[in-house]
Amino acid sequence: LSTGKIPDDCDTLIICTPKKDFDEIAANAIIDYINSGRNILWLNSAVTSEQNFPNVNKILALYGVKPFEIGIIRETDSSKMLQGSPDIIKPDALYSTITKDIAKDSGVRFINATKINLVSEEELENLKVNKTELLNASEKSYFRNNFKIQTDEISSSDVAGKFLVGAELEKTITEANEENGTKAVKSKMVIYGENNFTTDYPVSNYSQVTVFQLANNKDLVLNSIAY
């Protein structure tokens, strides 16, 4: 990205939880990449401190994604968590090209996940973005932004509800026009509110099992890249 151009043979650009803002050169390179009709896999873990990333947010905004909030998703439904750990959630997998086999099987597991906030349906339409929800945290989950609270039960400062944690966002760059032979140009962003599920992050301090090995996490990564 520092060269100002993403290689032509890069069909899917993977972005994992930016730790600092993109500079103008990198941001413009990504925008050019998007406008050429290529795809992004965006993996974002929970945000734990205030961030000022205008260029990162500018890229997300092209697909209707709002800036990530400070906080983490936790679960209260024992059937939607791993071994009594409310921070390791089992999101509901919705039927889609990426998740159809995962939805039929044992799903996926996310640790320290965050919610994906999108603009309104009307604003998505104005951006020419078509949304497909892939994964949702259950209706019994909650979003906690006060990390000093140690209890597993939902507190008065937590936000309860079902949260979007995986989505496919297809943006139309150029409309097809049969009269002049113009072909449609579209760019897809597949986005998840988690990135540890793609890594060797340990499930706990006492386990050699990694999050990547859980359930269908590996398949979700591969499907998202190949799609």
Task: Give a label for each model feature.
Residues 1-227:
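Acidic, S/T/G-rich, low-cysteine, solvent-exposed domains in lumenal/extracellular/periplasmic regions
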